[in-house]
From Swiss-Prot:
One of the primary rRNA binding proteins, it binds directly to 16S rRNA where it nucleates assembly of the body of the 30S subunit. Keywords: Ribonucleoprotein, Ribosomal protein, RNA-binding, rRNA-binding. It holds the Pfam family Ribosomal_S4. This is Small ribosomal subunit protein uS4. Belongs to the universal ribosomal protein uS4 family. The gene is rpsD.
Length: 206
């Protein structure tokens, strides 16, 4: 399955919530009717079955992190192998992706932009260039903008935008140096309450 290249707001409308696929310069509800699904019959909200609700939640989380189905299923399998709560393990694995950490640190306005920075070798981890978006960042890893990429206008703009947002407590960021430290593994209380990971576990457990 190819990566989705269509209108980003359409996906947020489909899920009925902001998937943070746009930069956030303007509130998403000023751009579209977030509570109305796209299409001719978008105003109608059909009652979902249990399976439908589970599928929608999986699609929502998959789209938030920009991950294809096969890769998402592999993350679930890994989360299920780990000790502890499978749903929480899944979210921790997704949060530990390098492209997500770059986004969370404010070096990119969206996860898609962060993925591009990583792929274009603009990111270093512990002083070494890493160009794999799915690379798992570990505790105490230092993630930084590569020296030759620090003058990019979009990175500076993203950092300015990030100053207006609440910073994740599990990361430590030095905006002036354009680097940050992955201080600790995020806890469930640190992450979005709008995600019902238990529905994803129920879906894949069948």
């Amino acid at each position: 399955m190819a990566r989705y290249l269509g209108p980003k707001l359409k996906l947020s409308r489909r899920e009925g919530t902001d998937l943070f696929l746009k930069s956030g310069v303007r509130a998403i509800d000023s751009k579209c009717k977030i509570d109305t699904a796209p299409g001719q019959h978008g105003a109608r909200k059909p009652r979902l079955s249990d399976y439908g609700s589970q599928l929608r939640e999986k699609q929502k989380v998959r789209r938030i992190y920009g991950i294809l189905e096969r890769q998402f299923r592999n993350y679930y399998k890994e989360a299920n192998r780990l000790k502890g709560n499978t749903g929480e393990n899944l979210l921790v694995l997704l949060e530990g992706r390098l492209d997500n950490v770059v986004y969370r640190m404010g070096f990119a306005a969206t996860r898609a932009e962060a993925r591009q920075l990583v792929s274009h070798k603009a990111i270093v981890v512990n002083g070494r260039v890493v160009n794999i978006p799915s690379f798992q960042v570990s505790v105490d890893d230092v993630v930084a903008i590569r020296e030759k990429s620090k003058k990019q206008a979009r990175i500076k703009a993203s950092l300015e935008l990030a100053e207006q947002k609440e910073k994740p407590t599990w990361l430590e960021v030095d905006s002036a140096k354009m680097e940050g430290v992955f201080k600790r593994v995020p806890e469930r209380s640190d992450l979005s309450a709008d995600i019902n990971e238990h529905l994803i576990v129920e879906l894949y457990s069948k």
